[in-house]
């Protein structure tokens, strides 16, 4: 079984809703602070899936800067899916001529930090429990 990316829009937003419902990670709080209609302001929003099984989520959005967000469901972590989502989003950013991408994560999320360093993000600051990183494309 191969994995595929599905671009999320208003037409298939129910798939994003399913992801939000089944994701139990305390490290992914994006939709706790926003409603699902936030995708209307995204540059790209994708779900990585294998047949009917959702594996993870990723997006690029613009809030004064371009921000990248990803989340892999717990049972799929450390299997290369985070890197696959990251590579897809970075390619999308390059295709759209984006020059710089930011991300944030909770400092206790060591798995995320390792992935972000691996793909070339650099730490820029920490505020309380949140770390910020940037990558020039």
Residue ranges of predicted features:
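Solvent-exposed beta-strand sheet faces enriched in polar/charged residues
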Residues: 61, 69, 104, 124-127
